[in-house]
Design a protein with these regions (language model features):
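C-terminal helix/juxtamembrane-tail motif
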Residues: 1-4, 15, 368-369, 471-492
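Cytochrome P450 heme-thiolate monooxygenase catalytic core
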Residues: 133-293
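Charged/polar low-complexity intrinsically disordered regions
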Residues: 66-69, 77-177
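Central I-helix of cytochrome P450 enzymes
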Residues: 237, 261-317, 343, 377, ...
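Conserved cytochrome P450 K-helix E-x-x-R motif and the immediately C-terminal K′/meander segment
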Residues: 42-51, 322-368, 378-383, 387
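N-terminal membrane-proximal hinge/A-helix region immediately C-terminal to the signal-anchor transmembrane segment
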Residues: 3-114, 422
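Cytochrome P450 heme-binding "Cys pocket" and the immediately downstream C-terminal segment
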Residues: 308, 418-419, 430, 436-473
């Protein structure tokens, strides 16, 4: 039709503009040498490439082809003071691209960057607020361990990652979802499995060219599965929320002390709409996944260093020997804190830190020009630097306890939740992990129960090597351990 005769020309202009935009971005990034020819090399040996890039380019910036956009520019750790608190470097936008934001089924990863999630954490999961939650968390930890690890006093084999994530999911859900859902099997199945399913779907999706993502995901079984999980999650949460809203309409003074209610309060305070299922799964991603990884790896490290078990048990007995939780109880488990921080130093969840997307052109003090929309990250190698840590590749459960006892500054920087340029386990600066206080609290609390109430050792021929994928370094999901119930006289 004559009225539509302009359409081919318009499409040609749009295509030409897109090609020119991509070409211009590539030209701006050409100043950074690319360390790998294909994204498969990044996916298979990301950490090795970082070491090679550091050696080949002598600490100067280089680029990793990740298969997404222009890849990631790896910067020298010396620029951390410039990047850590500069709003022109956005961690949320970096993660959104990595996790296929905008593709149906991955909405919880968009929720990770929403203001309402950060406000719910900031307003409710403060160190002071978390201390008040220890009693219900402890009660659920006790019940979850008994149900999942059993009270069998004979050695029996379990898949470590499977049992720990189920325990952490139940304990966290007490605070996230309250009594109605914290033991709901269908909901717990979703919270336990969603992240792994989404990660697998993302892996499959990344095999395709980026421009096909929005089409091909509809036909991939892995992507269909995560979409179905979100539908089910919404169906589970909706009636609980509707019931609560009716009850609160009848009695405005009614309060629920969980994240379902915190979101309702925050949404009214901020005058925004939100998707409860997306937000709850975002909380699960930020808390359950990282807590499970840290706890699983810590248990493996302790099993390889069994001389640590009894000193840890003695500390726990001295702190909560009377069975009473106090606001300072977990703060005083300083050896346990040190053990966890050492595990996080040796095996963080990623071999890079400070992943950011540049929201406008930036020129660093050393003259490095970072174009808008480029992705950047910093090699986390400082955590294994012999100039900073003595015998950095050797596990030392007392390392951070000694640093805390050595100086006032060490007390501030050597706690598990502390962030510093020398330890990027929880990030750094304005984008440091906001949920680290709750996550660390949950891990320490569950570990107190586990260490006092169970013996644990690695199964024969257990594989404890981390699972590496790109820059990710995850606790091995195939590791098997032997556990048995201990006869412990502390009742808490």
């Amino acid at each position: 039709m004559p009225g539509n005769s302009y359409v081919p020309y318009l499409m040609a202009i749009i295509l030409l503009a897109s090609v020119m935009t991509v070409s211009l971005r590539k030209n701006k990034l050409s100043a950074f040498p690319v360390i790998n020819a294909s994204k498969n090399e990044y996916l298979m040996s990301g950490r090795a490439m970082l070491a090679r890039g550091l050696k080949e380019f002598g600490g100067k910036p280089f680029r990793v082809n990740t298969g997404l956009g222009g890849g990631v520019i790896i910067l020298n750790h010396s620029v951390m003071p410039e990047v850590r608190n500069d709003a022109r470097f956005d961690s949320t936008k970096f993660l959104l691209q990595y996790w296929q934001a905008g593709i149906p089924g991955f909405e919880p990863y968009i929720a990770l960057g929403t203001e309402i999630l950060h406000n719910v954490i900031k307003w409710n999961l403060t160190p002071t607020g978390i201390a008040k939650l220890n009693k219900p968390l402890s009660d659920e930890a006790n019940a979850a361990l008994s149900d999942i690890l059993t009270d069998d006093e004979e050695w029996h084999e379990v898949l470590l990652g499977d049992v720990i994530i189920r325990i952490v999911a139940r304990v966290s859900s007490v605070i996230f979802l309250g009594p109605e859902l914290c033991r709901n099997r269908d909901w717990l199945k979703i919270t336990v499995n969603y992240t792994n399913k989404a990660t697998n779907a993302a892996k499959v999706l990344r095999r395709w060219p980026v421009f096909l993502y929005r089409t091909v995901h509809w036909f991939l079984p892995e992507c269909r599965e995560v979409r179905a999980m979100l539908v089910e999650a919404r169906q589970i949460i909706a009636p609980i929320l509707e019931k609560r809203r009716v009850q609160k309409a009848a009695d405005p003074s009614l309060e629920y002390h969980d994240a379902l209610d915190w979101y309702e309060t925050a949404a009214k305070r901020m005058s925004v709409d939100y998707d409860p299922a997306d937000q709850q799964l975002a909380l699960s991603i930020s808390a359950i996944l990282t807590s499970n990884d840290l706890m699983s790896q810590s248990i493996m490290d302790l099993c390889k260093n069994p001389e640590m078990f009894e000193p840890l048990r003695n500390e726990i007995r001295s702190v909560i020997g009377d069975g009473q939780w106090r606001p300072t109880s977990l703060y005083n488990t300083k050896l346990l804190d040190s053990v966890l921080k050492e595990t996080l130093r040796l095996k963080p969840v990623a071999a890079v830190g400070l992943g950011r997307r540049v929201v406008e052109d930036v020129r660093l003090k050393d003259g490095t020009f970072l174009p808008q929309d480029s992705g950047i990250a910093i090699n986390a190698g400082k955590m294994w630097d012999p100039k900073i840590y003595e015998n950095p590749r050797t596990y030392d459960g007392y390392r951070f306890l000694r640093l805390r006892e050595a100086s006032e500054q060490g007390e501030k920087t050597s706690q598990l939740v502390s962030t510093s340029p020398e330890h990027l386990g929880f990030g750094l600066g304005i984008h440091a992990c906001p949920g680290r206080f709750f996550g660390a609290n949950t891990v320490k609390l569950v570990m107190c129960h586990l260490l006092l109430k169970y013996d644990i050792k690695l199964a024969e021929n257990a594989n404890t090597n981390p699972l590496e994928f790109g820059f990710s370094m995850l606790a091995n999901p195939t590791t098997k351990v032997l556990v048995r119930r201990r006869k412990e006289d502390v009742n808490f």
